[in-house]
Amino acid sequence: MIYECEVTDIAPLRMPKVYRVKTVCGDKELELELHEEIVEAPKIGTKIAVTITNNKEECLNNYFCAHGYVVSNTQIGDIYRVVISLHGFLVVIKSKVPLEHKELEHFYIGVTYT
Protein backbone atom coordinates (compact mmCIF):
# COMPACT_ATOMS: atom_id res chain seq x y z
CA MET A 1 0.00 0.00 0.00
CA ILE A 2 1.29 3.46 -0.89
CA TYR A 3 0.16 6.47 1.11
CA GLU A 4 0.48 9.87 -0.57
CA CYS A 5 0.99 12.28 2.32
CA GLU A 6 1.70 15.90 3.18
CA VAL A 7 3.95 16.81 6.11
CA THR A 8 2.01 18.84 8.70
CA ASP A 9 4.49 18.93 11.60
CA ILE A 10 8.05 17.98 12.52
CA ALA A 11 9.08 17.68 16.16
CA PRO A 12 12.43 16.74 17.72
CA LEU A 13 12.31 13.87 20.20
CA ARG A 14 14.33 13.48 23.39
CA MET A 15 16.74 11.07 21.74
CA PRO A 16 19.46 13.13 20.01
CA LYS A 17 19.02 13.61 16.25
CA VAL A 18 15.66 11.79 16.18
CA TYR A 19 12.54 13.56 14.99
CA ARG A 20 8.86 12.75 14.44
CA VAL A 21 7.17 13.63 11.15
CA LYS A 22 3.38 14.02 11.25
CA THR A 23 1.55 13.69 7.95
CA VAL A 24 -1.96 13.67 6.55
CA CYS A 25 -2.61 11.03 3.89
CA GLY A 26 -6.17 11.49 2.64
CA ASP A 27 -8.40 10.01 5.34
CA LYS A 28 -5.46 8.66 7.38
CA GLU A 29 -2.71 10.20 9.48
CA LEU A 30 0.81 8.78 9.65
CA GLU A 31 3.57 9.58 12.12
CA LEU A 32 7.13 8.45 11.45
CA GLU A 33 10.15 8.59 13.73
CA LEU A 34 13.39 9.04 11.81
CA HIS A 35 17.07 9.79 12.50
CA GLU A 36 18.48 12.93 10.89
CA GLU A 37 21.80 11.25 10.01
CA ILE A 38 19.92 8.68 7.93
CA VAL A 39 16.96 10.65 6.54
CA GLU A 40 17.09 14.42 6.16
CA ALA A 41 14.06 16.03 7.80
CA PRO A 42 11.50 17.27 5.27
CA LYS A 43 9.93 20.71 5.49
CA ILE A 44 6.31 21.29 6.49
CA GLY A 45 4.16 21.06 3.37
CA THR A 46 6.50 18.57 1.66
CA LYS A 47 4.74 15.74 -0.16
CA ILE A 48 5.98 12.27 0.72
CA ALA A 49 5.05 8.77 -0.37
CA VAL A 50 5.07 6.10 2.33
CA THR A 51 5.08 2.52 1.07
CA ILE A 52 4.04 -0.32 3.39
CA THR A 53 4.74 -3.64 1.72
CA ASN A 54 5.76 -7.26 2.20
CA ASN A 55 8.12 -6.96 -0.78
CA LYS A 56 11.71 -5.98 0.01
CA GLU A 57 12.53 -5.13 -3.63
CA GLU A 58 9.58 -2.72 -3.82
CA CYS A 59 10.77 -1.03 -0.63
CA LEU A 60 14.34 -0.67 -1.90
CA ASN A 61 13.07 1.62 -4.69
CA ASN A 62 12.48 4.32 -2.06
CA TYR A 63 14.81 6.99 -0.67
CA PHE A 64 14.58 5.25 2.75
CA CYS A 65 13.70 1.60 3.41
CA ALA A 66 13.49 -0.31 6.70
CA HIS A 67 11.70 -3.37 8.00
CA GLY A 68 9.78 -3.93 11.18
CA TYR A 69 6.80 -5.50 12.87
CA VAL A 70 3.33 -4.46 13.93
CA VAL A 71 3.52 -4.14 17.71
CA SER A 72 0.06 -2.74 18.39
CA ASN A 73 -3.35 -2.62 16.70
CA THR A 74 -5.81 -0.77 18.92
CA GLN A 75 -8.88 1.43 18.92
CA ILE A 76 -8.81 4.59 21.03
CA GLY A 77 -12.19 6.30 20.97
CA ASP A 78 -13.28 6.37 17.34
CA ILE A 79 -9.70 6.16 15.98
CA TYR A 80 -8.04 2.90 14.94
CA ARG A 81 -4.29 2.91 15.44
CA VAL A 82 -1.57 0.58 14.16
CA VAL A 83 2.00 0.92 15.47
CA ILE A 84 4.88 -0.56 13.48
CA SER A 85 8.29 -0.71 15.14
CA LEU A 86 11.33 -0.32 12.90
CA HIS A 87 13.65 -1.70 15.58
CA GLY A 88 12.66 1.08 17.97
CA PHE A 89 11.67 3.82 15.54
CA LEU A 90 7.89 3.93 15.29
CA VAL A 91 5.45 4.35 12.43
CA VAL A 92 1.90 5.08 13.60
CA ILE A 93 -1.09 4.85 11.26
CA LYS A 94 -4.36 6.41 12.43
CA SER A 95 -7.69 5.85 10.71
CA LYS A 96 -11.41 6.16 11.34
CA VAL A 97 -11.92 2.71 9.79
CA PRO A 98 -10.35 -0.55 11.03
CA LEU A 99 -6.91 -1.36 9.61
CA GLU A 100 -6.18 -4.93 8.54
CA HIS A 101 -2.68 -5.22 9.98
CA LYS A 102 -2.12 -7.97 12.56
CA GLU A 103 0.25 -7.89 15.52
CA LEU A 104 3.72 -9.29 14.73
CA GLU A 105 3.07 -8.98 10.99
CA HIS A 106 6.32 -8.13 9.16
CA PHE A 107 6.49 -5.13 6.81
CA TYR A 108 8.96 -3.07 4.84
CA ILE A 109 8.44 0.68 5.12
CA GLY A 110 9.68 2.90 2.30
CA VAL A 111 9.71 6.71 2.32
CA THR A 112 10.29 8.97 -0.68
CA TYR A 113 9.98 12.74 -0.91
CA THR A 114 7.91 13.61 -3.98
Predicted regions and their residues:
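Mixed-charge, low-complexity intrinsically disordered regions
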Residues: 1-80, 85-114
